[in-house]
Amino acid sequence: MLDEVYIEKLIKKKFPLKHSFFPTGIGDDAAIVKTNSNKLVISCDSQVEGVHFDLDYFTPEEIAFRSVSVALSDLSAMGAKPKFFSNSLFIPKNINASFLNKLFNGFKKVCKFYNIYLLGGNVSKSKSLILDLTVIGEVVGKSYKERLNSKKNDFIYVSGNIGDASRGLNILKNKRTFSSPEKRLISKYKSPKAKVDLGIFLGQLKDVTSMIDITDGLALDLGRLIGPKTGGKGATIVWEDIPKSINHTESLSSKKLMKSVLNGGDDYELLFTVKNSKVANFEKLCKKNNFKVYRIGFVNSLGHLSLVKGGKVSNLEANGFIHKF
């Protein structure tokens, strides 16, 4: 019989019961963990069938890996090192024991990939599959990053190609056979990787003034990073400087490409600002530590976002994905 007792046994079978930092193990009313940090970083995220993923084109392992990766991306945006997560599962009637076994194989894989540990969670029945995660990290050293701390003339950077995931999702929705370049774009959507190492590295640098992860689209998250218009800050980004994969740029018209890159979302790249006077040293440090970063614009005092494309300046609306209820 598939019930919560079965799931608890499944979790205990696949995950070690106790560690030196996790004395209670899975199965108690709550988890007790030991940490060396005086600052914990905590975030939560939900992945909902029909909203964030579709069972028609996701395997159970992929669902598990993606759900944890996108949650950990929020910790990376704060410069934190991920340590633990808990997961509440809401399970519909069409999910069977084989599916759950594969799902927890995915959780085991993602734990190994990020060197993190599952603390436990909760289960309940539902009309659709929902994974509700809480992720816990710790501050490395004394420094962490927040949004809104950028200053006028700071330079704006991203950590990788923008728009690939959005294009990959579009391909998934409209095709059933894929070329190799299309498979690479689809992978960006289905299997994003949190920028953990880069986030920790940037978190320790005083010259990095603010940071966010790109979840809902470059333009929308840039607006969140810069802050409300009432604050007087604005930003200008240059289209030609935004990193885009060849697979992406060759497959879309100019208008569709702009929408995918600026408003698509699901990139889970880091978007951050660096002090104007320190960019040369910053870029040297990144190169020395084998981190690729891309300068795409600067903070100004115009009170709005703007885009430079082909030498022409236009207003950039902070549009992207927003949950509507």
List PLM regions with ranges.
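Helix-biased detector of long, well-ordered alpha-helical tracts
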Residues: 1-325
